[in-house]
From Swiss-Prot:
Annotated residues for binding of 1-deoxy-D-xylulose 5-phosphate: K125, S151, E152, S186, H209, S222, N227, K228, E231
Positions of NADPH binding: T10, G11, S12, I13, G36, N38, N124, E126, G215
Cofactors named for this entry: Mg(2+); Mn(2+)
Organism expressing this protein natively: Pectobacterium atrosepticum (strain SCRI 1043 / ATCC BAA-672)
EC class: oxidoreductase
Pathway the protein takes part in: Isoprenoid biosynthesis; isopentenyl diphosphate biosynthesis via DXP pathway; isopentenyl diphosphate from 1-deoxy-D-xylulose 5-phosphate: step 1/6
EC number: 1.1.1.267
Protein name: 1-deoxy-D-xylulose 5-phosphate reductoisomerase
Role, per record: Catalyzes the NADPH-dependent rearrangement and reduction of 1-deoxy-D-xylulose-5-phosphate (DXP) to 2-C-methyl-D-erythritol 4-phosphate (MEP).
GO MF annotation, one: 1-deoxy-D-xylulose-5-phosphate reductoisomerase activity
Chain positions recorded as Mn(2+) binding sites: D150, E152, E231
One Gene Ontology biological process: isopentenyl diphosphate biosynthetic process, methylerythritol 4-phosphate pathway involved in terpenoid biosynthetic process
Gene label: dxr
Catalytic activity: 2-C-methyl-D-erythritol 4-phosphate + NADP(+) = 1-deoxy-D-xylulose 5-phosphate + NADPH + H(+)
Amino acid sequence: MKQLTILGSTGSIGVSSLAVIKANPDKFTVRALSAGYNVKLMLEQCLTFQPTYASMADEASATALRQQLAEYGCKTEVLAGVQAACELAALDGVDQVMAAIVGAAGLLPTLAAIHAGKQVLLANKESLVTCGRLFMDAVEQSDAQLLPIDSEHNAIFQSLPEQIQRQLGYASLSKHGVERIILTGSGGPFRETPVSALADMTPDQACAHPNWSMGRKISVDSATMMNKGLEYIEARWLFNASAEQMEVIIHPQSVIHSMVRYRDGSVLAQLGSPDMRTPIAHAMAYPERVASGAKALDFCQIGALTFLAPDYARYPCLQLAIDACNHGQSATTTLNAANEIAVAAFLQSQIRFTDIAAVNQHVIEQLTLPEPTSVDDVLFIDSWARQVAAQTLTHYVR
């Protein structure tokens, strides 16, 4: 029986993770849950899974949860703040930590799990986008194990030899015959929208992903393909891949979740329904297999799989991310922070869809900070970029 802490339990990945746990009660149990401000859903989760601990982002949310749990006679101990999330990530007796807090807020709790030597199911892209080398060094030093949850990275992981799976971030791809990692993306809801019409796209249109069910921030990132850009950066770190060993292609059906091309001409791919329960169940049970509840693929119903090269005029955020990755950790941290501010403004209808890339590019162009050598450096760059992005928004506000 594996004991888990779920960081970000009320988000999309957290909810899917709990669904997999519920489907396999003989294999997994919840020790702790951590979330932001969604007291209503956290209450339901605590009553269903009876964790020993739960934490909320602030004291007001924690107090509200405490009072409601007391009414139901639930004995879950409720904590508050980032430090509480870090403590739950490092709890003795916890085998796995699902790191699913969206954004830079997930950085410190995820690192706490790494430093505690946990098996970390990594769904928080920002840990690698903002901390890269620092993060991978911490993994090596603490003897923690990373298992990727993003459907693309999980697909790549499954398509790689076991020797690389056991040495994520350090194994040589070429030594094991790997020629190229092929990252696939659907192209989002605006793949066929005229470029001239993109400025008029609304938040609701951007969040209507054709294949996946996701949170609103990640849905917008999918529409701009910034999501794929962040995944590109993450893949470079996770799989120790050079720019020459990476390729991004658009695959509208989202059936092939990513591929690995080998030296002998073979291409291994992982296919499945667009359901996050599949990679979650794979990582939770690794190296075994358990039921995820995901619908089986019907190849006859799919009919055809298609592919095309990304159009960088349509997806400038993807190009920005690739360029930032080649530039260094300061640039990727800056881009990630600026993008969070820009997307939040778009979701509140303060700026236009096409302004997201413009804001991101402007902030990147202001960057003169050196490469980070500590987490504090990363957090400083992150804070600086958010301030510059917020100032930049004033030029674009509708």
